[in-house]
Amino acid sequence: MDLPGPIHDFLLVFLGSGLLVGGLGVVLLPNPIFSAFSLGFVLVCISLLYILSNSHFVAAAQLLIYVGAINVLIIFAVMFMNDSEYSTDFNLWTVGNGITSLVCTTILFLLMSTILDTSWYGVIWTTKLNQILEQDLISNSQQIGIHLSTDFFLPFELISIILLVALIGAISVARQ
C-alpha cells in the first residue's frame, strides 16, 4: 500500500505488537481453543503485513490457506480430542443437523439443476489469452487467476478434490 511514512510505521508497529500478543497467547493460554483462536489472530496479522508490503496475492493465499483451512482444522481437532463435560449428553441427531442437511441438500439439487440446464456450448473459456496477458494494466494476481481458470483448470480441481477427501478422512479418523 502506498501510505505516508508515519502511517506505514504506525501500522507496522501495531501489527508487530499484535503478532507478539498473539504469539504469547498461543504459548501461555491454558485452554487449547483459546490458543487456536490466538493462532488465527497471528495468521491474520501476518496476512495484513503482506498487504502492507504490497503482496496482495500472498495475503489472500495466507488468509485462505492458513486461517481458512489449517486453523479451522486445528480448532476441529482440538474440539474432537478435548474431553469435555458435555460429551455425556451427546445426541445422535439434533434439530441443527436436520436444518443443515436440508439446506445442503437444497443447495446440491439447485446446483445440479443449474449445471444440467446450462448450455455449455456457448461458453468461451479464453478470449485472446496472449493479448490479455501482454497488457500492462493487468496485475500478477489476475494473471494467476487467468492461468488457473484456463491452463491449469483440471489440475487445480483435482488437487481440490484430493484435499477435500483427505480432510474428510482426517475428520472421520479423529472421530473414531
Swiss-Prot record:
Superkingdom, taxonomy of origin: Eukaryota
Predominant localisation class: plastid
UniProt KW keywords: Chloroplast, Membrane, NAD, NADP, Plastid, Plastoquinone, Quinone, Thylakoid, Translocase, Transmembrane, Transmembrane helix, Transport
Pfam family, one: Oxidored_q3
Transmembrane segments: 10-30, 32-52, 61-81, 92-112, 152-172
Membrane topology label: Multi-pass membrane protein
GO terms under cellular component: chloroplast thylakoid membrane
EC number per UniProt: 7.1.1.-
Location in or out of the cell: Plastid, Chloroplast thylakoid membrane
Catalytic activity: a plastoquinone + NADH + (n+1) H(+)(in) = a plastoquinol + NAD(+) + n H(+)(out); a plastoquinone + NADPH + (n+1) H(+)(in) = a plastoquinol + NADP(+) + n H(+)(out)
GO molecular function: NADH dehydrogenase (ubiquinone) activity; quinone binding
Family that this chain belongs to: Belongs to the complex I subunit 6 family.
Subunit structure of this chain's protein: NDH is composed of at least 16 different subunits, 5 of which are encoded in the nucleus.
Function as written in the Swiss-Prot or TrEMBL entry: NDH shuttles electrons from NAD(P)H:plastoquinone, via FMN and iron-sulfur (Fe-S) centers, to quinones in the photosynthetic chain and possibly in a chloroplast respiratory chain. The immediate electron acceptor for the enzyme in this species is believed to be plastoquinone. Couples the redox reaction to proton translocation, and thus conserves the redox energy in a proton gradient.
Protein name: NAD(P)H-quinone oxidoreductase subunit 6, chloroplastic
Species this protein is from: Capsella bursa-pastoris (Shepherd's purse)
Highest classification ranks of the organism: Eukaryota, Viridiplantae, Streptophyta, Embryophyta, Tracheophyta
